[in-house]
């Protein structure tokens, strides 16, 4: 049963772009996306704070679900919709502070053991990856593939789930067919020849998410 320790999210989050700039956040919100993540890596808090503030303000303006990757202290300080953490960040993060601030929490997983760890934290949603080979970040694990993804989705049938990793426009329908509630994409939009068209097509496949 879905009883998170953090505020809940819609069962289906729909299309979920993960981008590294406020410019992309604004573009995608304007294009109709309503679930997004700002993922800026390897910079100090003071270097990213202005971007986090601007992204959160945009999320509020569009009534969107904006998650901040990793910078949980800034997310709390500026009252983001939510925070997304990788497995390696869970132990070093004050989950009680995130919970007390009323922020949603998403957690990355790559196998059954990591799903167990995520479930113990009782987050708002669980991300399942990486589904396909990806060039976006170095991954220590092998791609799961659609069969493994479907098995994890079935195991987490009551939980909001997000598939991530190497999901292209061509692969998106098969990913959604597993029953996963959301697809997180990066290069499928940011490296598309026509990002507006790619976003519109992905929104048709994955939707904007439940209210």
From Swiss-Prot:
It is an enzyme of class 2 (transferase). Pfam families: TMP-TENI (PF02581). Keywords: Magnesium, Metal-binding, Thiamine biosynthesis, Transferase. GO terms for molecular function: magnesium ion binding; thiamine-phosphate diphosphorylase activity. Signal peptide: none annotated. Its EC number is 2.5.1.3. Pathway: Cofactor biosynthesis; thiamine diphosphate biosynthesis; thiamine phosphate from 4-amino-2-methyl-5-diphosphomethylpyrimidine and 4-methyl-5-(2-phosphoethyl)-thiazole: step 1/1. It catalyses: 2-[(2R,5Z)-2-carboxy-4-methylthiazol-5(2H)-ylidene]ethyl phosphate + 4-amino-2-methyl-5-(diphosphooxymethyl)pyrimidine + 2 H(+) = thiamine phosphate + CO2 + diphosphate; 2-(2-carboxy-4-methylthiazol-5-yl)ethyl phosphate + 4-amino-2-methyl-5-(diphosphooxymethyl)pyrimidine + 2 H(+) = thiamine phosphate + CO2 + diphosphate; 4-methyl-5-(2-phosphooxyethyl)-thiazole + 4-amino-2-methyl-5-(diphosphooxymethyl)pyrimidine + H(+) = thiamine phosphate + diphosphate. 2-[(2R,5Z)-2-carboxy-4-methylthiazol-5(2H)-ylidene]ethyl phosphate binds at residues 134-136, 166, 186-187. One of its GO terms (cellular component) is cytoplasm. Its cofactor is Mg(2+). Condenses 4-methyl-5-(beta-hydroxyethyl)thiazole monophosphate (THZ-P) and 2-methyl-4-amino-5-hydroxymethyl pyrimidine pyrophosphate (HMP-PP) to form thiamine monophosphate (TMP). Belongs to the thiamine-phosphate synthase family. This is Thiamine-phosphate synthase.
């Amino acid at each position: 049963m879905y009883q998170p320790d953090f505020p809940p999210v819609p069962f289906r989050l729909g299309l979920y772009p993960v981008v590294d700039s406020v410019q992309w956040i604004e573009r995608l919100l304007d294009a109709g996306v309503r679930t997004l993540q700002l993922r800026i890596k390897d910079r100090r808090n003071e270097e990213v704070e202005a971007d986090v503030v601007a992204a959160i303000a945009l999320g509020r303006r569009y009534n969107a679900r904006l998650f901040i990757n990793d910078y949980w202290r800034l997310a709390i300080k500026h009252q983001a919709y939510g925070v997304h953490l990788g497995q390696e960040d869970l132990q070093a993060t004050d989950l009680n502070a995130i919970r007390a601030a009323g922020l949603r929490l998403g957690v990355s997983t790559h196998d059954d053991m990591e799903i167990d760890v995520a479930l113990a934290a009782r987050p708002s949603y669980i991300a399942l990856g990486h589904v396909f080979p990806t060039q976006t970040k170095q991954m220590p694990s092998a791609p799961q593939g659609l069969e493994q993804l479907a098995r994890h989705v079935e195991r987490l049938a009551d939980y909001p789930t997000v598939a991530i990793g190497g999901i292209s426009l061509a692969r998106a329908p098969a990913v959604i067919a597993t029953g996963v509630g959301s697809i997180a994409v990066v290069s499928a939009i940011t490296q598309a020849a026509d990002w507006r068209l790619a976003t519109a097509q992905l929104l048709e496949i994955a939707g904007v998410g439940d209210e």
